[in-house]
Design a protein with these regions (language model features):
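Acidic, low-complexity intrinsically disordered regions
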Residues: 15, 45-48, 93, 100
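Arg/Lys-rich, positively charged N-terminal/basic patches that mediate binding to nucleic acids
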Residues: 1-34
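Short, hydrophobic secondary-structure boundary micro-motifs
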Residues: 29-30, 50-53, 96
Length: 106
């Protein structure tokens, strides 16, 4: 299934990658590699992952948790593909990205 990253998710990813890279060279690259793997898993089986607990029931929003980093990838399943809504830190600003899904609802 086709996957696209919401433009704001690209910004999330860039900010997180830059932060980790400043903490230790190579760590930002590790984050990006882990996210790429998660995207492959989502594409292979988008409905295998749990629904986002606080998402509106009318939206098909699911999530993948990254095993090594404290991030989740919330994604919206649509008839024409999957939209990754955010690279969301698990402990910061819960649900800040939900408005991105509401704007994309089709």
């Amino acid at each position: 299934m086709k996957i696209v990253l919401h433009p704001a998710a690209v910004a999330d990813l860039s900010a997180a990658g830059d932060w980790y890279e400043r903490q230790r060279p190579g760590l930002g690259v590790d984050l990006i590699v882990e996210i790429e793997r998660a995207l492959e898993v989502i594409a292979e089986s988008p409905t295998a992952w749990p629904r986002w607990p606080d998402a509106p029931t009318e939206l098909e929003i699911r999530r993948v948790l990254l095993p090594r980093f404290p991030f989740a990838l919330p994604y919206l399943i649509q008839s024409n593909g999957i939209v990754v809504l955010a690279v969301a830190h698990e402990k910061r600003r819960p649900g800040y990205w939900l408005r991105r899904a509401k704007r994309r609802k089709r």
